[in-house]
Amino acid sequence: MTFSQKTDTDVLLIGAGIMSATLGTLLHALEPSLRLTMLERLDDCGLESSMGWNNAGTGHAANCELNYTPQRADGSVDISKALQVNTQFDISRELWSHLVTTGAIPDPRAFLHPCPHMSFVWGEENVAFLKARHAAMAAHHCYHGMDYSEDPAQIAQWAPLVMEGRDPAQKIAATRIITGTDVDYGALTHLLVGHLKTAGLDLRYNSEVIAIDRGDDGIWTVTFEDTVDGTRQQITAGFVFIGAGGAAIELLQKSGIPEAKGYAGFPVSGIWLRCDVDAVAARHHAKVYGKAASGSPPMSVPHLDTRVIGGKTSLLFGPYAGFSTKFLKRGSLTDLFGSITASNILPLLDVAKDNAALEEYLIGQVFQSRHHQFEMLRQFFPQARRADWQEAVAGQRVQIIKPDQGDPGGQLEFGTELVAASDKSLVALLGASPGASTAAAIAVHVLQTCFADRLTEDGWLPALRGALPSYGIDLITDAEACSASRKATAKVLKIDNIDA
């Protein structure tokens, strides 16, 4: 990838959420002279899925999320996906530590707080699963220090609200690791964008992209409209990153690149229950994840969480999944229909045919009564009072429907994926899970995909290792490097660590 002074900007970031902010931050660290421009359709950064109350704020390290550790037919548990997510979060920790050390982020407490991560289950079958899961995870250095208990008294010390009022005859089990975190990704986005703005970022709010065109010279021309007065402008760029959350699929389609053919989006909405009562929130300090219902999407795993947003501690429970045809929380009900094309209609229909259990689950969630929703909370918090809780709408999650290779059908993917132009001059990030926690790892993937020629010893590599000391090291297999990374980042970020 080479840049030209013929363009208005070197790098154009579409969307002002955590993904664009992280990629922009990393690019600036590697080459401060790069001209960066960011376009955002709303009037501030981080207002969609990055905003504090639009996501769970879990520093997803696959400590407690049971959907990352499926059980095999023989009863053993596969932790390979969990290890991948776990070490991807280490990359985020290293980048944040670098930003704190260099003064770009003055205080990590502005967005990050230590918070134990727990898994909690009930019933003989689920207890057996959690015990097998703990045995597999605790044996690996990445999960050193993870505790397991079936003792109600011990679990009550870890999470008193979960145990008070619970049937003493109920078979229960929990795991706990103290190295977990609660992250306000909205606050982090503001910190990153503010840092980039100080460094020269051309930031344009109220700017909605309406066209993305590539010229014969390979230069991209992006047309955007002022959402306040309706005026239109154009900007040329050598490299375009589409990090617009749920809207990324539509923007990718506007680019016209052949690689986008067949891709579609499947939106899933969510609702939280939120408690701002100080006396209640003060008695729960953990993120407690349970087991998802059969057929439910990964982001629907129920959990009772400590949240710290704007300096205030609250509790969150959910999410309750739902369906909306919007691709963004502040989007349009026509988003899904407008994204249907001749190339993706067959993959969409194929996915609809093959995912009856998911569709049945979502329909059930949509028509679920408030009483039923609250009873679900009481499975985690038996003595919860209805008056203490209010509903809050989560950000939209748009899952990937991708074409089958050599087949007109499609498949539903619960994850994230980069779709890049053949010349690597444009790339879009699709998908939703695990999302913000792996933003730094995704940014590194963008570098490897689109800027491989610059990742050399006389190019960006020295600066990249300065920002991410573990770059090029497999923390899953290198226990010593993993321990060293976590010890160093825990100290800088003021979070808990367990020495190996």
Curated annotation (Swiss-Prot):
GO molecular function annotation: 2-hydroxyglutarate dehydrogenase activity; L-malate dehydrogenase (quinone) activity
Catalytic reaction(s) noted: (S)-malate + a quinone = a quinol + oxaloacetate
Database matches in Gene3D superfamilies: D-Amino Acid Oxidase, subunit A, domain 2, FAD/NAD(P)-binding domain
SUPFAM superfamilies: FAD/NAD(P)-binding domain
Taxonomy, superkingdom: Bacteria
InterPro entries tied to this protein: FAD/NAD-bd_sf, MQO
Keyword Flavoprotein recorded: yes
Name of a matching Pfam family: Mqo
EC number, as in UniProt: 1.1.5.4
Single GO BP term: tricarboxylic acid cycle
Protein keywords: FAD, Flavoprotein, Oxidoreductase, Tricarboxylic acid cycle
Swiss-Prot/TrEMBL cofactor(s): FAD
Enzyme kind, highest EC tier: oxidoreductase
Pathway involvement of the protein, from the record: Carbohydrate metabolism; tricarboxylic acid cycle; oxaloacetate from (S)-malate (quinone route): step 1/1
PANTHER family xref list: L-2-HYDROXYGLUTARATE DEHYDROGENASE, MITOCHONDRIAL
Assigned protein family: Belongs to the MQO family.
Name assigned to this protein: Probable malate:quinone oxidoreductase
